[in-house]
């Protein structure tokens, strides 16, 4: 459960990402593909090179989903319900892949936010991304 301080930290960190959210999430996805090659199986016929149009497009989708979660911190299950259905029933993404992506989101944010990505922000973002992952995998039964 996110504390009031966590929510403040998450909103603040996401606001610092700002207009770079699509690019940063594309970079996080690219890092995920490099670090965990099995994640590529969900993206047939993709150009996996850095900055490809497909990675940019998917990065923006991820950024939009994260932004939606940030905007609905008090009711993420409702806000992300359709995405949860999509990933569980249609795409059938292995839940471990959310952990891989979340790790790389943290790495990417740390790389770009530098000193603004404090240990406290890191901890709050980690809790937030774990909560998003839990919501996205909640319909896997």
Curated annotation (Swiss-Prot):
Modified residues (N6-acetyllysine): 16
Binding residues annotated for heme b, in chain numbering: 87
An annotated GO cellular component: blood microparticle
Superkingdom of source: Eukaryota
Binding, O2: 58
Gene Ontology molecular function terms on file: haptoglobin binding; heme binding; metal ion binding; organic acid binding; oxygen binding; oxygen carrier activity; peroxidase activity
Keywords, ordered alphabetically: Acetylation, Heme, Iron, Metal-binding, Oxygen transport, Phosphoprotein, Transport
One Pfam entry name: Globin
Globin domain segment(s): 1-141
InterPro entries per UniProt: Globin, Globin-like_sf, Globin/Proto, Hemoglobin_a-typ, Hemoglobin_oxygen_transport
Modified residues annotated as Phosphothreonine in this record: 8, 108, 134, 137
Positions of modified residues (Phosphoserine): 3, 35, 49, 124, 131, 138
BP term (GO), one: hydrogen peroxide catabolic process
Modified residues (Phosphotyrosine): 24
Tissue: Red blood cells.
N6-succinyllysine modified-residue sites: 7, 11, 16, 40
Similarity field: Belongs to the globin family.
Function: Involved in oxygen transport from the lung to the various peripheral tissues.
Quaternary structure annotation from Swiss-Prot or TrEMBL: Heterotetramer of two alpha chains and two beta chains.
Name of the protein: Hemoglobin subunit alpha
Source organism (scientific name): Didelphis virginiana (North American opossum)
